[in-house]
From Swiss-Prot:
Residues covalently joined to lipid (S-diacylglycerol cysteine): 20
Protein name per the record: Minor fimbrium subunit Mfa1
Family: Belongs to the bacteroidetes fimbrillin superfamily. FimA/Mfa1 family.
Domain of life of the source: Bacteria
Organism per entry: Porphyromonas gingivalis (Bacteroides gingivalis)
C-alpha cells in the first residue's frame, strides 16, 4: 500500500475552503480519473464523555476556548493511505457553549469502504509517525501508540496560546462505506463521516472557599463534641500538580487505561530508583506554583474562565491498583503560624518571622529554638533522636488527589485522571497542621541519574504523618477539606478539608 497526499480540487475553492498538503514520493493523489465521488468529514467534541468519565464529582459542562490550528485526515482504502492536512482556512469551526464542531469542505475520493482517522492540532512527532506508515496495519499501530506528553519541545499535547487551549485531539477511527457518484453539493448529506474526538489533555485547578481572616486561613481542629479549636493559621497558599504520565495514547484505550497503568509500587524501593515512578511520571512542574484562587461561593462552571490551571496527561489504573505513589496529586504549600496557645513557654517571643518552626511531638508545642525543642522532646526512653519535626521557613504542605471516587477521605480507593476533563479541587476548610514537605517525589540511590526529579520540598524524616508511596489512597487523618470538580470539557469539583 502506498502513501498518497491529497489536495482539494480547485473547484472547491469557490466554497470558501482551501487545503494545504505535503508532497510525497508515492503516486499522484486521487484525481478525476480515479475519484468517482465526494465526501466530507465532521468532527465534534463529545457533549458527554464515555460512561465512567464523569462518575466522580461532576458539576456540569464547559464548552472551552479551543485554538484550532489544523485538522489532519487519513483516509485508508483501495490500497492507499490518503492524507489531508487542512488549516483553519479550510475548515468550518463552530464553538458553542458546551461543544465544538469542525466540518471540512467536500473532497474527491474513490468510493468504497474507507477507514477514516482524524487528528486536530497534530504535533510534529505524531505527524511524523503516522506519515511514516505505508500500509493500513502500520498506520493502525502508529495511531494506537504512546507518545511523549510534554517532554518533546514543540510536540506537547497542550499549550496555552493567547488564553486559548491549543491541544491535540483524537478519537476512534470510523469505518464507513463512501457512496459513488455523490456531488460536492450532496457530500455533506450522503458521504459525511462523523468522528468524535477528545482533547488529549486534562486541566487541573485549585480554589478555596474558606474565607480568610486578616489574609490568613484559620486551622481549626475538631475536638470531641464537634468543638472547633483554633490551633494555627496558614497563608500564602500556592499549588502545583505532579505524578501524571510522561506518555499518552494518541487513541484513548476503550478502558481508558494509560501507558503506565501496570505500575503499582509495592514498596518504597519499587517507587524509587530509575525503574520506579520517575520512569513513568512527570514531576517537572512542582516548582512552578500558582496562587490558590479565592472564591466567595461554591465553584461552578461560570468560574472556569477565571481560575488559573495547569495541563496534565491522562493517568489511570485498574480499579484496585491506585496507590499514593502512582496517582496524580495537587500539592499545596502555605506559610504556617501557630496560635499563642500552641507555643512552648517563651518561644513565641523568640521567633522571627520566616524562620524555621520546630514542632515537639512529645509536648505538642512549637519552638523557635531547635535546641530547646530537642531538649523538651526526647525520644522514647530518653535516648536516640529527639522527636521534633522541622517546618523549614514555616512552610507547610497538603496534598489532594484530582478525582477521588468518594467524598470521604477514609474510603477513597481510586482517583482516575481522564482526558478531556477539568478537575478542580476546592479547599473548604483546614482542620490540621499539614506535612513538613512533599512525600511523593521519587529518589534514586545513584546520584548521577539525570532523570531523578528535583524535590524542592523534601519532608523532615521525623514527620510521623509522612505517607508511603505504596499505600492505598485512603487517609485516616484529614488535613483539609476539599471538594473536587471535573468539566465537554466535563467539569468536576470536590471539597476537601485539610
Amino acid at each position: 500500500m502506498k502513501l498518497n497526499k491529497m489536495f482539494l480540487v480547485g473547484a472547491l475553492l469557490s466554497l470558501g475552503f482551501a487545503s494545504c498538503s505535503k508532497e510525497g514520493n508515492g503516486p499522484a493523489p486521487d484525481s478525476s480519473s480515479t475519484a468517482d465521488t465526494h465526501m466530507s468529514v465532521s468532527m465534534s467534541l463529545p457533549q458527554h464523555n464515555r460512561a465512567g468519565d464523569n462518575d466522580y464529582n461532576p458539576i456540569g459542562e464547559y464548552g472551552g476556548v479551543d485554538k484550532i490550528n489544523d485538522l489532519t485526515v487519513y483516509v485508508v482504502g483501495d490500497g492507499k493511505i490518503d492524507v489531508r492536512k487542512l488549516s483553519t482556512a479550510d475548515l468550518q469551526v463552530n464553538q458553542g457553549a458546551s461543544t465544538t464542531s469542525i466540518v471540512t469542505a467536500p473532497f474527491q475520493v474513490k468510493s468504497g469502504e474507507k477507514t477514516v482517522y482524524a487528528i486536530v492540532n497534530i504535533t510534529p512527532k505524531v505527524e511524523a509517525a503516522l506519515n511514516a506508515a505505508t500500509n493500513a496495519a502500520d498506520l493502525k499501530v502508529a495511531y494506537e501508540a504512546a507518545y511523549a506528553a510534554f517532554s518533546d519541545a514543540g510536540s506537547e499535547i497542550a499549550t496555552l496560546v493567547n488564553n486559548q487551549d491549543q491541544m491535540i485531539m483524537s478519537g476512534k477511527p470510523v469505518v464507513q462505506t463512501i457512496l459513488a457518484n455523490v456531488s460536492a453539493a450532496n457530500a455533506s448529506v450522503q458521504n459525511k463521516v462523523p468522528i468524535i474526538v477528545k482533547r488529549a489533555a486534562i486541566r487541573a485547578s485549585m480554589t478555596i472557599t474558606q474565607q480568610p481572616v486578616n489574609g490568613a486561613y484559620e486551622i481549626k481542629a475538631l475536638r470531641p463534641g464537634n468543638v472547633e479549636v483554633g490551633i494555627a493559621t496558614v497563608s500564602d497558599l500556592k499549588w502545583a500538580v505532579a505524578q501524571y504520565e510522561k506518555k499518552y495514547y494518541l487513541q484513548q484505550k476503550d478502558n481508558a487505561l494509560s501507558p503506565a497503568a501496570s505500575f503499582v509500587p509495592a514498596s518504597t524501593n519499587d517507587y524509587n530508583g530509575a525503574n520506579g515512578a520517575m520512569k513513568h511520571y512527570d514531576y517537572s512542574q512542582l516548582a512552578n506554583r500558582i496562587t490558590v484562587h479565592q472564591l466567595n461561593a461554591p465553584y461552578s462552571v461560570t468560574d472556569v474562565p477565571n481560575v488559573a490551571y495547569k495541563y496534565v496527561s491522562e493517568t489511570t489504573h485498574a480499579d484496585n491498583d491506585y496507590r499514593k505513589g502512582n496517582t496524580t496529586y495537587i500539592l499545596v504549600k502555605g506559610k504556617l503560624k501557630p496560635v499563642a496557645a500552641m507555643w512552648a513557654d517563651g518561644e513565641q517571643a523568640a521567633y522571627q518571622e520566616g524562620g524555621d518552626l520546630f514542632l515537639g511531638l512529645v509536648t505538642g508545642k512549637f519552638y523557635a529554638n531547635e535546641a530547646n525543642a530537642n531538649a523538651a522532646n526526647p525520644a522514647s526512653g530518653g535516648a536516640g533522636n529527639p522527636r521534633v519535626v522541622t517546618y523549614k521557613a514555616a512552610a507547610v504542605y497538603y496534598y489532594a488527589w484530582l478525582n477521588p471516587n468518594t467524598l470521604d477521605p477514609t474510603t477513597w480507593t481510586m482517583s482516575p485522571a481522564r482526558r478531556n476533563n477539568i478537575y478542580n479541587v476546592n479547599i473548604s476548610k483546614f482542620r490540621n497542621i499539614g506535612l513538613s514537605g512533599n512525600p511523593f517525589v521519587p529518589t534514586d540511590p545513584d546520584p548521577n541519574n539525570p532523570d531523578t526529579p528535583d524535590n524542592p520540598d523534601t519532608p523532615d524524616p521525623e514527620d510521623p504523618d509522612t505517607p508511603n508511596p505504596e499505600e492505598p489512597l485512603p487517609v485516616q487523618k484529614t488535613y483539609m477539606v476539599v471538594d473536587v470538580t471535573v468539566t465537554p470539557w466535563t467539569l468536576h469539583n470536590y471539597d476537601i478539608e485539610f
